[in-house]
């Protein structure tokens, strides 16, 4: 689901410490907005399109993308007659290497409308896999791009390279990333710009990238580390297509619109059956872009102890499990729920009806648009609101575990419009003035009602949030 409504919020950091911290994280990883990012290249207007600029593909541009495109692949068992001239001394994949390559193939099939079929007959395969020991050009790995006229392309890997000698093919390993990268080439994806490992001068982000998003935070097809665009993966590599890879491959072949159509959990308690989406313990390292097609879905990062920043908006990046910008959400995808860990987390909702649970720690909870259900968990938590649109009377948020004297509701940056220069202030009854706030307690339901009037008679355009539990006090609020 794309964001249909946008929240406008002030960039004037005159709010509370927590509200200003939220603003910082709403702008995280956005070039020109995030002060921690050095922008060496201008952002692309369509970075995904850059990956398919050569229009390399299987089939034709006008093929029906609603029908899955079938590709056969094979692991070579002997030296082929058409082995590239600059490599020699063929060797076959062992079973562990085959299994890793199949996981990379599966990761592309998960996001694109492509049906991969394995065949033992190499001659009928569209994509082949093989190793070599010697390269006249010093190649580590390479693959050939497809065209509508071709019937077969090969992917080749240097068996004597440190990556494969060390068998670094597990999830987050460089070998696994290499398989995913080279398979991307066989499907028609290029490097983000016109550089290659065979260039006389080794490519660098500064000298070879032509736009900001050319990093391994955005695409497995890049040569350049994620730190160039502000992220930090602490030495691990993506095992699956990332944000711009997914958009690019779907533009060519269409999307896989049936995968993960039910309620899906990513992270701890994952039901994805994908290792790169799964956290097993507090030492797990996650690196992925979530592609999801339906259901009521959850980012469960409850087992991590570090301070996390979890953003549920499409095309956004989250800091999870001690890494920076390591989790993102594909364009057009809605993840409804998030569960934080035991650190001091920031949870940011989208325009769906989110369920956000902070867990232990002093968390910042921001539901955004939609009728949200919010839990701070243990610790001193702050629920921030920036606009009446985030909890109008007909789509009210519910805060379920507020503890008076510990937790806070922060409206210090609440947008009251041009007429609300006086800020939010408590009154006994609404009189129609902008910024008037009323706090009521229902002793029967044990629910607090907090409302803000934007002017005139209180109506569906105003603000109303429900707070479950014991009576709360005006001192539990941070006003503008």
Swiss-Prot record:
Listed SMART domains: ZnMc
A Pfam family reported for this protein in Swiss-Prot or TrEMBL: HemolysinCabind
One GO BP: collagen catabolic process
Range of residues in the leader sequence: none
Binding site for Ca(2+) 2: 295, 297, 334, 336
An annotated GO cellular component: extracellular space
Enzyme Commission code(s) on record: 3.4.24.40
Residues at the active site: 182
Catalytic reaction(s) noted: Preferential cleavage of bonds with hydrophobic residues in P1'
Residues annotated for Ca(2+) 1 binding in this entry: 260, 263, 292, 294, 297
Cofactor note: Binds 1 zinc ion per subunit.
Sequence positions that bind Zn(2+): 181, 185, 191
Hemolysin-type calcium-binding repeat copies, ranges: 339-356, 357-374
Cofactor: Zn(2+); Ca(2+)
Record key words, sorted: Calcium, Hydrolase, Metal-binding, Metalloprotease, Protease, Repeat, Secreted, Zinc
GO MF, any single term: metalloendopeptidase activity
Compartments (UniProt record): Secreted
Keyword Zinc annotated: yes
NCBIfam families (UniProt xref): Zn_serralysin (NF035945)
Family in the record: Belongs to the peptidase M10B family.
Protein name: Serralysin
């Amino acid at each position: 689901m794309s964001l249909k409504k946008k929240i406008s919020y002030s960039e004037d950091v005159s709010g509370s410490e927590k509200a200003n911290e939220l603003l910082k994280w709403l702008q995280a990883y956005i070039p020109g907005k995030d002060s921690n990012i050095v922008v060496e290249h201008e952002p692309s207007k369509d970075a995904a399109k850059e990956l398919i600029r050569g229009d390399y593909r299987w089939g034709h541009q006008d093929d029906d993308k609603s029908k899955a495109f079938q590709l056969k692949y094979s692991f070579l068992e002997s030296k082929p007659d058409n082995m590239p001239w600059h490599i020699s001394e063929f060797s076959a994949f062992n079973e562990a290497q085959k299994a890793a390559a199949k996981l990379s193939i599966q990761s592309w099939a998960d996001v694109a409308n492509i049906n991969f079929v394995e065949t033992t007959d190499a001659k009928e395969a569209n994509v082949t896999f093989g190793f070599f020991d010697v390269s006249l050009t010093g190649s580590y790995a390479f693959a050939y791009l497809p065209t509508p006229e071709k019937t077969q392309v090969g992917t080749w890997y240097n068996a004597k390279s440190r990556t494969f000698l060390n068998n670094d093919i597990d999830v987050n390993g460089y070998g696994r990333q290499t398989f995913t990268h080279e398979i991307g080439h066989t499907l028609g994806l290029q490097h983000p710009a016109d550089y290659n490992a065979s260039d006389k001068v080794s490519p660098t982000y500064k000298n070879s990238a032509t736009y900001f998003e050319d990093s391994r935070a955005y695409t497995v097809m890049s040569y350049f580390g994620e730190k160039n665009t502000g992220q930090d993966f602490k030495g691990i590599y993506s095992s699956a297509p990332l944000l711009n890879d997914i958009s690019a491959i779907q533009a060519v072949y269409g999307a896989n619109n049936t995968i993960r159509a039910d309620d899906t959990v990513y992270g701890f308690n994952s039901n994805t059956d994908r290792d790169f989406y799964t956290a097993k313990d507090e030492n797990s390292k996650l690196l992925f872009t979530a592609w999801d097609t339906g259901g009521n879905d959850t980012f469960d990062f409850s087992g991590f102890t570090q301070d996390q920043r979890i953003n549920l908006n499409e095309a956004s990046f989250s800091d999870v499990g001690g890494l920076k910008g390591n989790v993102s959400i594909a364009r057009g995808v809605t993840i409804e729920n998030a569960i934080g860990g035991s650190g001091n987390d920031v949870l940011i909702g989208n325009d769906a009806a989110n369920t956000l649970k902070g867990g232990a720690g002093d968390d910042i909870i921001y539901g955004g648009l939609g009728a949200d259900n919010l839990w701070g968990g243990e610790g001193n938590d702050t629920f921030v609101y920036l606009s009446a649109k985030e909890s109008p009377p007909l789509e009210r948020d519910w805060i379920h575990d507020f503890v008076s004297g510990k937790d806070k509701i922060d409206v210090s940056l609440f947008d009251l419009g041009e007429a609300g220069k006086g800020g939010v202030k408590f009154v006994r009854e609404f009189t129609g003035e902008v910024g008037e706030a009323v706090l009521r307690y229902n002793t029967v339901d044990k629910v607090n009602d907090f409302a803000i009037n934007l002017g005139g008679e209180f109506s569906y355009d105003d603000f109303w949030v429900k707070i479950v539990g014991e009576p709360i006090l005006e001192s539990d609020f941070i006003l503008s």
